[in-house]
């Protein structure tokens, strides 16, 4: 009997190793995030430039916000069922500290996130090489009228101090992680698994609307540092790191990690720790460590009355009591 190519492919390359599966998912998810997000930024800049090099009109914040939200939504849709779609080292670090991810797997996640972002920057540069050439006339510039480095990495406004840059990154990423915790918390609004990517996309759009002016919404270390390294490799030079101050490049790397931890702790202190004991459920969502049960948002053990929450807002007393690893 003939088998389909999909069946053959699955039998040929299927891997049961959790580290490999989740690593591949994080690579592809982060690749898509950076590819679509930065591609949208490039399109937004080029669409407001006249043939003579002048700006036809300012950048449309709505374009950037909705484009960013859609990019994240697609990335989470693609990779969420396998790895939980962290796609951000700051999110992974927070999950590690909160006990939702093992130390070794967190290293795999973060490494593959940076790799996916770097590869996305290289593909995007190849796709838009001719357009970038027409934009900057062959002279790679980081900032200025013909600067294109900001299409790949974040740079603050000239008048923004280092202290404000740090506060901006911490606050923005703190709100990001707080929002993610609320979305994936089955004790809260119990967002269905299939709707999680949509709500995370809305969250990103809201943050870009609110925190993109100072420094371009520096919320993701992988999305920022990996493309910045690519810029340095292809000829933008050390200025890719030193523009707007020699310390700026560290802000989008360190700040989001601090902000993510603060956001996660804040959510637990103000919301997560205050559910009534008779309705407290054990979180197991697509943002948790990969597992055949929790990665697909299956079931969550509740009380000894053998009522099992199945992710669809109903209880089934016929399901045997079991423990779900989160």
Curated annotation (Swiss-Prot):
Keywords tagged on the record: Cell membrane, Glycoprotein, Membrane, Repeat, Stress response, Transmembrane, Transmembrane helix, Transport
Annotated transmembrane regions: 24-44, 64-84, 107-127, 166-186, 196-216, 247-267
Keyword Phosphoprotein among UniProt keywords: no
A GO CC term attached to the entry: basolateral plasma membrane
SUPFAM superfamilies attached to this UniProt entry: Aquaporin-like (SSF81338)
Glycosylated residues, chain numbering: 146, 294
InterPro entries hit by this protein: Aquaporin-like, MIP, MIP/Aquaporin
Placement of sequence motif NPA 2: 220-222
Pfam families in the record: MIP (PF00230)
Record's bilayer topology term: Multi-pass membrane protein
Induction: Expressed in early embryonic state, adult active, and adult anhydrobiotic state. Transcript abundance is high and expression levels are completely unaffected by desiccation or rehydratation.
Subcellular location as annotated: Cell membrane
Reported function: Aquaglyceroporin that may modulate the water content and osmolytes during anhydrobiosis.
Annotated PANTHER family: AQUAPORIN OR AQUAGLYCEROPORIN RELATED, AQUAPORIN-9
Protein name: Aquaporin-3
